Amino acid sequence: MDAARQNPVDHDPAEGSRVEDGVVEHPNADDFGHARVLPEDRTWFKRAVFYEVLVRAFYDASADGSGDLRGLIEKLDYLKWLGVDCLWLPPFYDSPLRDGGYDIRDFYKVLPEFGTVDDFVALLDAAHRRGIRVITDLVMNHTSDSHEWFQESRRNPDGPYGDYYVWSDTSQKYADARIIFVDTEESNWTFDPVRKQFYWHRFFSHQPDLNYDNPAVQEAMIDVLRFWLDLGIDGFRLDAVPYLFERENTNCENLPETHAFLKHCRKVIDDEYPGRVLLAEANQWPADVVEYFGDPDTGGDECHMAFHFPLMPRIFMAVRRESRFPISEILAQTPPIPEMAQWGIFLRNHDELTLEMVTDEERDYMYAEYAKDPRMKANVGIRRRLAPLLENDRNQIELFTAMLLSLPGSPVLYYGDEIGMGDIIWLGDRDGVRTPMQWTPDRNAGFSKANPGQLYLPPNQDPIYGYQSVNVEAQRDSSSSLLNWTRTMLAVRRRHAAFAIGTFRELGGSNPSVLAYVRELDRDGEHDIALCVNNLSRFPQPIELNLQHWNGYTPVEMTGYVEFPPIGQLPYLLTLPGHGFYWFSLKASEEKP
């Protein structure tokens, strides 16, 4: 790692930005050391398995009750052992923490309880040494109201930051824009007593939206990108990107101006940092989200990846209804994406299980099935972890994970789901799904040596999901544990490139309770065919599949290498146990050992 260069001014760059004569001065990347960079690979994200980890929740190396960057470094060997290719870190920037770090006070400073910029560079370097990439959230739409840009904007409307935010003398503009946080916000406008104007916010009132109609704001955010990319980060999940611009008589989402700015960001990446990645967080319908990949004729010139939000709730819906059609229909509605693009798919993350992209009837059904206790609801979603959502049913957990790893897109795991961690529904907001990682049955779940009262949140002590019974140490030693099963499935997926970059063909079949599809890769010397069959019913189910296209091929089960009867002209009959699944590799006669 390069030695850190000395800052010529009498100011420690680790202290972040500062205000001098009404101007906010930011540190430079050359003030810090830089991490080693992995070999350039412009398509690594298409084959990667992502793992979302909250820095605060993973491991506390400083024994102050909160996880930190040094603690994450200590656990990189576990993540390498598990089979993770890329870490996704939610915001670790300096913040008043009124919204879990998504209210950023300084883009150029690490939250002190997490560490320093040098600690982050050390994390990047240690991860890259193990072949693990790291991306983080960049909240582009808004800042905290304690950010110096906002403080200068409200104090001095005629100063350099006076137009950094969206101000108005009235709260009636952009009336067609929906309110996102309906539980807490009555309006997208809030009156500021200092400037005596209203400011615009799509999220909480303490998160004013930046004014992207101001070119200075666009360049300021590009500078933030460059700062962290220079240090060695592998990419960004761009948070809340549909809302960057506002226009009257629109819903202020997915506007052409937003796409133009993202093209500018992508050009910076391609020209200056090839191999780095932009991942769009756009909770929209597939036809709208696909626009965030950019021009298909160029292979994509906006974001490299985008989350497929509507797919996730329909996986839950399909299994509870014991019908493949919720999944089949949303995949059929998903347009093709550019060649250099990839979906990101997930089951759970640090937010609620969002139900924005379902109909009112479907939302009521999901609440009735998965959130019987009113405390389980949050905003327009359900604040529960995967294992409790599935009633801790190992067969369901395995089925859901198998679909996550085999449907089109790069899978994103959420920390703790690999061991079946539970939630604490009596904690406020979404904290119930953000509790400490459960490493051992020892005090504080092995997460921290601090006194229990110092912990940022209590570890789960539930009789079923508590750390005394659900922890990494116990499961790592058990060959039949969920942890070792997950590790095995990640290894199987890595051996079969069709899961990552193969085509997708749904097979239909005689039984609507069974979802069957083929992932096939045949290019650049790689030939791989994966047949996936998923029983969405709790009861055993038969299925007849038309596999004539692969006549003469032999299905070989991927985990045990068991050969099934060769495929012929007749429908291929399989019987699956309740919530069971098969992963087959289809082998031509000349490929069989």
Residue ranges and their predicted role:
Residues M1-P593:
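Active-site and adjacent substrate-binding regions of carbohydrate-active enzymes
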